[in-house]
């Protein structure tokens, strides 16, 4: 549609994209200016080596922020890192940041944490920005109305050298979630339900904009959970239009605009939401009121179902590729079709990650664990997403609730989300995890992962099997 002048309305993604195009040429990707570049120890070393070989410097070190998160241990952080590969990567990041003048939040620093937790926490993430990081879950920052996506190591080098990035313009998808969530149903359940609905390739080539009354009702931290897992639906990025909830979260944060700059920023930010007459390439509808707690049963985030249901029978899948994938998944997960999901027992519960390691997530888990005990034989790791989140949780007494229940209270890091640090599953162990990926071996070779919300994770810790808080009453 157009406004009567022949000019079609634009989506939020289109507005931000067009405002950041540095150069455009027929048959070539657009060259985008990048407002914020986040880096960590895993995907940056080769990029810095490339700069040295070419004799280049970092063009905008002031727009580049580094943290240590993927490989860092979450215990004994005052001691040297035991794993030699992890230690080398962390030490290399420190040397590179010192050489090229990049601000680094090292292990133990109050502002250290998972890269997608500290960006918003510090007010670095702002509406209308282009944000990149050598990490799949950079889409988290889209919760603020930013265009944020993950990039590869060669692209990390390109951004370091030029503060630009060549990209082909993606398509747009609107996911509208109307209605009201029932008690015990969270933003994690929304995104797991969406991925189960459209599949892990349903958003391929698109930027997803999440809309609707259920999205508007979410806090910023809940919105970040949804945008974080956009990549698990195959999307390039996920976004939510900025509103008063966004502005209230940002105001007063260390890197947020101040004074007159704040007022000017608000004026710009309010211009970003999608125009009423804009047209999306694809549209998907979800009814929030029909959703219930979701869990995954397989080995990709799209293989999920309501907790009230049973392990599906691959024979019921009409698509032969999906049927084969389900058969392989059930063999790996050691599950039988028809088994009630609530009967699946776990060895480990992990509460943390860039998906669900923020203060609201920890409060939710603590509300379930308070006055209760972890089931015998179940190990529970609670890992805050940043050292600032850890400090806030301890100020609120959440750490005591976790410890009293029998959980382990750790320092900040990616931890058991991925098998790149000491926090891993042993072969054959099964976890309920608030993270974002349940691939084979993701949490350790031979480990089996069920993705859940913090509420379900905490209830599972008490019950010893997949459970919702209502099951404990």
From Swiss-Prot:
Q: Name one Pfam family in it.
A: Aconitase
| Keyword Protein transport assigned | no
Superkingdom: Bacteria
> How is the cofactor bound here?
Binds 1 [4Fe-4S] cluster per subunit.
Q: Give the matching InterPro entries.
A: 3-IsopropMal_deHydase_lsu, Acnase/IPM_dHydase_lsu_aba_1/3, Acoase/IPM_deHydtase_lsu_aba, Aconitase_4Fe-4S_BS, Aconitase_4Fe-4S_dom, IPM_dehydratase_rel_enz, IPMI_cat
Enumerate the cofactors the protein uses.
[4Fe-4S] cluster
Using the record, list the residue span of the signal peptide; answer none if the entry has no such feature: none
Q: Family assignment?
A: Belongs to the aconitase/IPM isomerase family. LeuC type 1 subfamily.
Q: What does this protein do?
A: Catalyzes the isomerization between 2-isopropylmalate and 3-isopropylmalate, via the formation of 2-isopropylmaleate.
Q: Which proteins does it associate with, and in what oligomeric form?
A: Heterodimer of LeuC and LeuD.
Q: What protein name is recorded for this chain?
A: 3-isopropylmalate dehydratase large subunit
């Amino acid at each position: 549609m157009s406004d009567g002048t022949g000019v079609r309305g634009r989506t939020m993604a289109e507005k931000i994209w067009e405002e950041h195009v540095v150069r455009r040429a027929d048959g070539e990707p657009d060259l985008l200016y990048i407002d914020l570049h986040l880096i960590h120890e895993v995907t940056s070393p080769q990029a810095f080596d490339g700069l040295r070989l070419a004799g280049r410097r970092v063009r905008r070190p002031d727009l580049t922020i580094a943290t240590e998160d993927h490989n860092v241990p979450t215990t004994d952080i005052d001691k040297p890192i035991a794993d030699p590969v992890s230690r080398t990567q962390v030490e290399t990041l420190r040397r590179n940041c010192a050489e090229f003048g990049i601000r680094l939040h090292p292990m133990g620093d109050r502002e250290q944490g998972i890269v997608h937790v500290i960006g918003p926490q510090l007010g670095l993430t702002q509406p209308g920005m282009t944000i990149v990081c050598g990490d799949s879950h950079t889409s988290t920052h889209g919760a603020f109305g930013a265009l944020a996506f993950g990039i590869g190591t060669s692209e990390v080098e390109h951004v370091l050298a030029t503060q630009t990035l060549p990209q082909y313009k993606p398509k747009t998808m609107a996911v509208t979630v109307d209605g009201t969530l029932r008690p015990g149903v969270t933003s994690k359940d929304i995104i797991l339900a969406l991925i189960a609905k459209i599949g892990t390739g349903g958003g391929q080539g698109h930027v997803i904009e999440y809309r609707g009354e259920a999205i508007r009702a979410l806090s910023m931290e809940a919105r970040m959970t949804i945008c974080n897992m956009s990549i698990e639906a195959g999307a390039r990025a996920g976004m939510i239009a900025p509103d008063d909830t966004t502005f209230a979260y940002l105001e007063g944060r260390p890197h947020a605009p101040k004074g007159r700059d704040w007022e000017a920023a608000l004026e710009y930010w309010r211009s970003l939401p999608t125009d009423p007459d804009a047209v999306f390439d694809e549209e998907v509808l979800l009814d929030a009121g029909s959703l219930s707690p979701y869990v995954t049963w397989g080995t990709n985030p799209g293989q999920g179902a309501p907790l009230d249901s049973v392990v599906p029978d691959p024979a019921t899948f009409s698509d032969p590729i999906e049927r084969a994938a389900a058969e392989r998944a059930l063999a790996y997960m050691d599950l039988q079709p028809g088994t009630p999901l609530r009967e699946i027992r776990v060895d480990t519960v992990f509460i943390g990650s860039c998906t669900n390691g923020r203060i609201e997530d920890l409060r939710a888990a603590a509300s379930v664990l308070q006055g209760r005990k972890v089931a015998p034989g179940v190990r529970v790791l609670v890992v805050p997403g940043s050292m600032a989140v850890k400090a806030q949780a301890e100020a609120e007494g959440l750490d005591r609730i976790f410890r009293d229940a029998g959980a382990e209270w750790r320092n900040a890091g990616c931890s058991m989300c991925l098998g790149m640090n000491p926090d891993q599953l042993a072969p054959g162990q099964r976890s309920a995890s608030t993270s974002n990926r349940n691939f084979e071996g993701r949490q350790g070779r031979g480990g089996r992962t069920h993705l859940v919300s913090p509420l379900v994770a905490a209830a599972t810790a008490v019950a010893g099997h997949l459970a919702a808080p209502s099951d404990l009453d």
